[in-house]
Amino acid sequence: MSDFTHFNEQGRAKMVDVGEKPISQRIAVAAGRVLVSEKTFGLIQSGGMKKGDVLTVAQIAGVMGAKRTPDIIPMCHPILMDGINLELSLDEERRSVEIKATVSCDGRTGVEMEALTAVSTAALTVYDMCKAVQKDMVITDIRLLSKTGGVHGDYFREEN
């Protein structure tokens, strides 16, 4: 079990001690999408959803989600984030809401989980705001696009 950083000698879960790691700038970018019907797409685009401006509310929810990441991911460290930016856009060809989150900090641990949680929360908010019109929306392709900083080096996803 000693090869696994999130388990102690007894095989029980533990939070990794990052106290000895050097502080470095960390940036993570994540993305995802919500596939919607033509009707739902039109209502989002025109601002006609009864619950309000879907993209603005989802953007705010994504920021809130990033800030709450250690509350819902058990072994995630609470960290002081320097910035959280969500970009939501409509893709007519895919008929989707495209979501991208960028999270940054100067710290001892990365912000990948915060970026992924921001995207997930924004996507769930899109679903919540549109579910009265459409129940079969699909939340999909939530993924880490890149991460920089830290001892494990940089990562950049190759998109097809």
At which residue positions do the language-model features occur?
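C-terminal binding/interaction regions
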Residues: M1-L55, I60-H77, G83-N160
